[in-house]
Amino acid sequence: NVEVYAMLAQLKRDKSKNPDMLTILCGCMMQEPEVIERIKKSYRNVDIIFGTHNIFKLAELLAMRLFDQDAKRMIIDIWKDTTEIVEELPNSRKYSFKGGVNIMFGCNNFCSYCIVPYVRGRERSREPEDIIEEMKGMVADGVVEVMLLGQNVNSYGKTLEHPISFAQLLRQVEQIEGLERIRFMTSHPKDLSDELIEVMSQSDKICKHLHLPLQSGS
């Protein structure tokens, strides 16, 4: 937090020299009410603040700030929680041959030293059809390696109307033609199943390692 406030102080000085500059804050830290109050009080140079649940609204908030004369003030749009997942968002990749795919959001574990359940909400899984469709599009663009992402991928699928296991999802992902390597993170040990171990042992595409969160030991 100290680094963020130091950066805001620097940006405040920069904005005094360039009044048209916009300062936008987002992410986990913005989900904390005391942080918002401090920014409102001490860093009025900030133009837009939003949290972890509505990143897809960036363009809308930016347009509001730029073109709405009634919005020439600090815009704060924080969602305390959500059950929604917005699909078909545009994305860009740093590398042409690999990319990450979110399969779920939030977490139901409350490990020591971890703020995720408080700021990103409870677990919400994407429908497998949406995941597969996104990955097929990536492969068509030349991607050969994917990283399946979630705070705890081992508990994927439990919140779906028609629940499936993470191992079952991996079997579907394996069937995508042109996809060569599959990685995933993060895997909470308490939800690691024998089915997942079996799928990994039988697969020629799934990389043979597990990414375990250190805080799960607490």
Question: For each predicted feature, which ranges?
Answer:
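Conserved SAM/AdoMet-binding glycine-rich loop
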Residues: 23-27, 32-34, 140-218
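Proteins enriched for Cys/Gly/acidic motifs involved in redox and nucleic-acid/cofactor modification
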Residues: 1-149, 154-156, 210
